[in-house]
Amino acid sequence: VGNNKLVYNAFNYQLMSISQINENNKEEGVIRTFDEDENLISIAYIENSKGVMGIYREYYPWGVLKNETPYYTSEINGKLKNYYPDGLLKEEYTYYNNKKEGLATMYYESGQKFAIENYKNDLKNGDYYMYYENGNLGMKAFFVNGKREGTIEFYEEDGKKIEKNK
């Protein structure tokens, strides 16, 4: 890859992005973008003719990782992860060809699991569990093609089952 390309805001001359330019004068390689205070906010990798490749990373202004999105030929493929402002994992989803596929897990800011759900072709499919922050099950449901089926089971914070709903 050839030269670096720096893009500045025309009004205040603040750095907006740095990218690499190939011999055909197209962006290729690592691209970094910055906020108005010139804090790094994202890093991506562009591969000639294939688009975004690898892990796209976005950052909070104070430098903590905000999310990681796995790309292959500009489509999301793999585990997408979002983080709380302190850097702890907030949620993770598995993607295949830009669609949620498989297990997804959400977390409280404490790090304890909040919910677990399953996806098929971008729709909720299968068991869905929601938890109290103490780790006890709070709700259990089942989905088929994005629609709830059957009963929802609810539990008190101490784990005692409290009701069923249709």
Please provide the spans of the model-predicted regions:
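Glycine/tyrosine- and acidic-biased, solvent-exposed loop/turn segments at the edges of beta-strands
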Residues: V1-K166
